[in-house]
Amino acid sequence: MKADIHPKYAEVQVTCSCGNTFETRSTLGKPALHVEVCAACHPFYTGKQKIVDTAGRVERFRQKYGNVQRLG
C-alpha cells in the first residue's frame, strides 16, 4: 500500500438546526459540521410529519404565471 495517500480521519462535532449535537469521525477536515436534519428531528425517525411551508413560493408562482393563458 502507498504511504500518506489517505486523508486524516478525525473527530467532528455535528450540530443540527434543532439543537441536537453529537460527535462522529470524518475526513471533512474541519472540527465542526452544521446540518439541517438529524436522527432526533427527521420525520422518519420521530414518526411525526414535518410540514414545510411553501405558501410563499406558490403565491409568487401564481403572481408570475397567473395571467398566462393556455395555447391551443
From Swiss-Prot:
GO CC entries:
ribonucleoprotein complex; ribosome
Note the SUPFAM superfamilies from the entry: L28p-like
Q: Does the keyword Iron apply?
A: no
Record note on cofactor: Binds 1 zinc ion per subunit.
**Which residues are recorded as binding Zn(2+)?**
16, 18, 38, 41
Q: List required co-factors.
A: Zn(2+)
GO MF entry, a single one: metal ion binding
Q: Name one GO biological process term.
A: translation
Per UniProt, subunit arrangement is: Part of the 50S ribosomal subunit.
This chain's protein is named Large ribosomal subunit protein bL31
